[in-house]
Each structure stands twice: as structure tokens, then as C-alpha cells.
Amino acid sequence: MGIARILSAVLFLSVLFVVTFPTLLSADHHDGRIDTCRLPSDRGRCKASFERWYFNGTTCTKFVYGGYGGNDNRFPTEKACMKRCAKA
């Protein structure tokens, strides 16, 4: 019975890998992670007012960040945003 469980686990993990592998190669991934430059701006959950920059698909735009939460499409300067997100 122990060998059957091991074989079942190996089969499950193999199927999981085959199903998820194409997603890892999709255009929304960059260096194995979701491309942060495609995420929408996200103010976060708090009420602070920090000036930050996000990439809107064309250029970097200023927005007010609340200080907590949000996503990774948030940069301290326009220059940092353009360096990470602008296509050459």
C-alpha cells in the first residue's frame, strides 16, 4: 500500500507540472515571475500619501500610494519605473 501512495503522488506531481509549465512560459512572465509592469496601479490599504510611479502600459504615471499593500507596479521615481518597464 505504501508504494501505491508514492506512485500516486509521483503521478499527481507529474500531471501538475505538465499543466502549469506552459503558464510559466507565457508572455505575462518575465524571468520566472509575473511582469509587474502589466499590473494596474494599486493605492494599497492605508491612508498615507506617498508619491509613487506606476507603468500604465505606455509610460510611467504618478499616483498616491497609501503606504501598505498594493502590488509591485510601484516605483519611488519615474526614472526607476522607466528603467524597469520601458521597452527599448
UniProtKB/Swiss-Prot annotation:
Pfam families: Kunitz_BPTI. SUPFAM superfamilies: BPTI-like. The record marks 39 as: May bind Kv1.x/KCNA. Residues 1-27 form the signal peptide. Expressed by the venom gland. The keyword Repressor does not apply. The record marks 47-48 as: Reactive bond for trypsin. InterPro entries: Kunitz_BPTI, Kunitz_BPTI_sf. GO terms for molecular function: potassium channel regulator activity; serine-type endopeptidase inhibitor activity; toxin activity. PROSITE patterns: BPTI_KUNITZ_2 (PS50279). Its main location: secreted. GO terms for cellular component: extracellular region. It comes from the Eukaryota. Residues 28-33 form a propeptide. It is found in: Secreted. One of its GO terms (biological process) is envenomation resulting in negative regulation of voltage-gated potassium channel activity in another organism. Keywords: Disulfide bond, Protease inhibitor, Secreted, Serine protease inhibitor, Signal. PANTHER family: KUNITZ-TYPE PROTEASE INHIBITOR 2. Belongs to the venom Kunitz-type family. 01 (intermediate) subfamily. This is Kunitz-type kappaPI-theraphotoxin-Hs1d. It comes from Cyriopagopus schmidti (Chinese bird spider).
